[in-house]
């Protein structure tokens, strides 16, 4: 009989270090934040083609890497994906490839990050990030009180300003987030 933990966490990540979260798999990731430090991970308990997650952490270097990967499991133990929650008291660099995912970036401190794949992204008002690179097919919801600059080809609401530097959602305010769209991507922005 095989037994794998469907939930694990590390709440002891130091706020003295930045962390690089690396995920690369053909499954769904639901990413959210929580008040505190560290991370939690659990399975999306529905049929799928994804193995249970495990995390490998480096203890040296800057940023310190946390790599999520699939455990090799029987096809009977495959799940729909993973729910991952990140502590809002750590600084994260995201490098994620996933499919049909929901990425909630509402209350996180991020260094420049990359998201690849497909799904929905929510940029929350408490997001702290300089730049985000998107590659793939995404629908991105932007709250009215977050000023962003979108560089590259993307579908944006009609009321956004198409300036020489890119598309601005709040042209009366200084943008605080730069989102770069990689060529060949299909990204739709909407106000939320």
Where do the language-model regions lie?
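Membrane-interface segments at or immediately adjacent to transmembrane helices
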Residues: 2-40
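Short, surface-exposed interaction patches in beta-rich subdomains
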Residues: 8, 12, 35-36, 43-44, ...
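Extended Gly/Ser/Thr-rich low-complexity repeat segments
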Residues: 31-34, 75-91, 189-192
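Short loop/beta submotifs within extracellular cysteine-rich repeat domains
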Residues: 28-30, 101, 186-188
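Hydrophobic, well-structured mid-protein blocks that either form specific transmembrane helices
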Residues: 91-100, 105-112
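Short, well-ordered beta-strand segments enriched in hydrophobic/aromatic residues
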Residues: 20-23, 27-29, 96, 129-132, ...
């Amino acid at each position: 009989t095989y037994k794998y933990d469907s939930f694990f966490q590390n709440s002891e990540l130091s706020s003295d270090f930045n962390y690089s979260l690396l995920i690369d798999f053909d499954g769904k990731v639901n990413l959210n934040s929580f008040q505190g430090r560290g991370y939690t991970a659990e399975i999306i308990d529905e049929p799928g083609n994804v193995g249970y997650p495990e995390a490998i952490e480096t203890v040296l270097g800057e940023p310190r890497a946390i790599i999520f990967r699939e455990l090799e499991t029987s096809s009977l133990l495959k799940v729909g994906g993973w729910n991952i929650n990140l502590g809002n008291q750590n600084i994260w660099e995201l490098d994620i490839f996933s499919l049909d995912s929901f990425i909630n970036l509402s209350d996180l401190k991020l260094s420049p990050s990359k998201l690849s794949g497909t799904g929905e992204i929510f940029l929350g008002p408490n997001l702290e990030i300089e730049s985000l690179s998107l590659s793939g097919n995404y629908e991105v919801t932007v709250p009215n009180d977050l000023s962003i600059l979108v560089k590259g080809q993307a579908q944006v609401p009609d009321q956004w300003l198409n300036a020489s530097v890119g598309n601005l959602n709040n042209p009366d305010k200084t943008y605080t987030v730069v989102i770069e769209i990689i060529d060949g991507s299909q990204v739709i922005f909407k106000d939320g």
